[in-house]
Amino acid sequence: MPGRFITLEGGEGVGKSTQAKALAAALRARGLDVVETREPGGSDGAEAIRRLLLEGAADRWNARAEALLFAAARADHVARTIRPAIEAGRWVVCDRFLDSSIAYQGGADGLGDEAIRTLHAIGSAGYLPDRTLLLDMPVFDAAFRQAEAGIANSDRFEKRDEAFHDRVADSFRRIAAQEPARIRTINAQGSPQEVTARLIEALADLLP
């Protein structure tokens, strides 16, 4: 049975981390061998870069520096964690991947898609997921969810202003419209169980 690479994407507060864990558990319940990972991070080198990217003031890095750091972390992550797992026939569920760089640095911060994809081609040979699940909900509702959970403004990106997060959401929707074969947009509102069921449904054609 071939391994599969599944990514979860979306803006701040849409529930990616919660749903990545729930999706991995649901896939294991179906008898699949699943690796859970995240970006930035997922390998020793990438986790070190994660700390550089997420800690500190919102303006610690400019968009170009961020894009380079993300690409470096991703290159190590793909080489050391993702590709070996896929080649061993395992399923990989990853909280964020390339599309986040396109939406955040490429779209919201104005570097453009081409620059981000060029870095990805250099660092990770253009490696792409088998399926990307984009969790989508209004930015205001996502921010309210974070505030209720007491996790608002916990890293550099969450500290950015509302206009930035609106641009991120718009960029994700644009990317999804451009790549409908790979990306499925999932309504992130409702109970966690309802959202997980939508994720599983969006993977139906890949499941054994």
Swiss-Prot record:
Pfam families: Thymidylate_kin. Its EC number is 2.7.4.9. ATP binds at residues 10-17. The keyword Metal-binding does not apply. It catalyses: dTMP + ATP = dTDP + ADP. This is Thymidylate kinase. It comes from the Bacteria. The lineage of its organism: Bacteria, Pseudomonadati, Pseudomonadota, Alphaproteobacteria, Sphingomonadales. GO terms for molecular function: ATP binding; dTMP kinase activity. It comes from Rhizorhabdus wittichii (strain DSM 6014 / CCUG 31198 / JCM 15750 / NBRC 105917 / EY 4224 / RW1). Disulfide bonds: none annotated. Keywords: ATP-binding, Kinase, Nucleotide biosynthesis, Nucleotide-binding, Transferase. Belongs to the thymidylate kinase family. Phosphorylation of dTMP to form dTDP in both de novo and salvage pathways of dTTP synthesis. GO terms for biological process: dTDP biosynthetic process; dTTP biosynthetic process; dUDP biosynthetic process. One of its GO terms (cellular component) is cytosol.
